[in-house]
């Protein structure tokens, strides 16, 4: 080896000298006078990170809480999940049980009675019963309801009837026992009747002679008062009359506007009437008696309940021994033979009756015409009085049915 080569070897770094010759693949060094290219630092390759699992998809029911939800110190914020867990056991209220009406012939023991209560206050002694054939007799109703207790009144109308007991227990028992029973091949509906509608009435004194109910209505109209009834006692004229109004407010106004005013040369006075006389109606039916039927018929009715479906008591129902006779041909004139007496003419139409009310059972469900029942058309008409269609059931008369010769009941005076 020459000296030049040895000198060059000595100038190399030790790492190069010690390395094997076959592993040295370096380029020969450049001349010192040649400019060296600047070395650009190589960028380090990015390190591959471990793959991250994607976030679990949220359930459809999970709704993210609002960003402005309040967070209190020392307490955790309530999330939507907490709210759902707190209300997951919330259940709607259970519906009330429904009791269907029993089939014909089945008793209702163990069930609440089917009152089918309608809006408004109901009587606890007066019952509404339907359906009945148009030719149903009062004696048949007495046989049905007589065993449950003394009755005050049985009133038969077209296709339905009202039965009033003296005691509430008797009425409740009648509903339980009779409701759903078959009569004339139809199940009966027995429910409580509505209470009489309240009446707003005033009595008038010192009316001029010749005054009629139309004159009183005109007087009220001139004073901007709405009326539902007007009446003047013209049979035995004593200068008294009455007006009825649809509300308490109008009644109060009438007391202020009509008291001590001059009317056809007379100064009239008016007073509130808190106990008005009952409204009489001409209809079928007419039994009244506080004692009810007692003692029983000897022979009973032919075949019991001939209509079928309802087995009456063995002993029938109480009453006079002679039984009932038939209806007289002239309408309601009492019973002709062996029964209750009565004048041939029947009812004497009061002088302050209905003008043209809408009566009868028309709308409504169980027991339930809206107005309970109204007077039949033409039953209360007449030339000396007029109702403008009052609404509501006014209940039973206070006294027994009057004959034509009986004195007329006058409006109470104070």
Swiss-Prot record:
UniProt-listed PROSITE patterns: RRM (PS50102)
Q: Which GO terms describe its molecular function?
A: double-stranded telomeric DNA binding; eukaryotic initiation factor 4G binding; identical protein binding; mRNA binding; poly(A) binding; RNA polymerase II complex binding; telomeric repeat-containing RNA binding
Q: Which residues form the RRM domain?
A: 125-195, 200-275
Please give the residue ranges the record annotates as the region Disordered.
Answer: 1-119, 269-299, 343-414
What does UniProt give as GO cellular component? cytoplasm; cytoplasmic stress granule; nucleus; ribonucleoprotein complex
CDD domains attached to this UniProt entry: RBD_RRM1_NPL3, RRM2_SRSF1_4_like
Q: Which residues form the signal peptide?
A: none
Which residues are recorded as modified (Dimethylated arginine)?
288, 290, 294, 298, 307, 314, 351, 358, 363, 377, 384
Subcellular location(s) per record: Cytoplasm; Nucleus; Cytoplasm, Stress granule
SMART domains this protein is in? RRM
Q: List, as start-end ranges, the regions of compositional bias called Gly residues.
A: 286-299, 379-389
Cite the Gene3D superfamilies for this sequence: 3.30.70.330
Residue ranges the record marks as coiled coil: none
- Sorted alphabetically, which Pfam families does this protein's record hold? RRM_1
Which residues are recorded as modified (Phosphoserine)?
Answer: 15, 79, 182, 212, 224, 356
Which keywords, in A-to-Z order, does the entry hold? Answer: Cytoplasm, Methylation, mRNA processing, Nucleus, Phosphoprotein, Repeat, Ribonucleoprotein, Ribosome biogenesis, RNA-binding
PTM remark: Methylated by HMT1. The methylation is required for nuclear export.
Task: Give residue spans, biased composition: Low complexity.
Answer: 33-51, 346-360
Q: Which residues carry this modification: Omega-N-methylarginine?
A: 302, 307, 314, 321, 329, 337, 344, 351, 358, 363, 377, 384, 391
List this protein's GO terms for biological process. Answer: mRNA splicing, via spliceosome; negative regulation of termination of RNA polymerase II transcription, poly(A)-coupled; negative regulation of translation; positive regulation of transcription elongation by RNA polymerase II; ribosome biogenesis; translational termination
- Family membership, please give it: Belongs to the RRM GAR family.
Give a short account of what the protein does.
Involved in mRNA processing and export. Required for efficient splicing of a large set of pre-mRNAs by efficient co-transcriptional recruitment of the splicing machinery. Remains associated with the mRNP during early steps of translation elongation.
Q: Any further remarks?
A: Present with 78700 molecules/cell in log phase SD medium.
Official protein name in the record: Serine/arginine (SR)-type shuttling mRNA binding protein NPL3
Source organism: Saccharomyces cerevisiae (strain ATCC 204508 / S288c)
The beginning of the lineage is: Eukaryota, Fungi, Dikarya, Ascomycota, Saccharomycotina
Provide the gene name from the record: NPL3
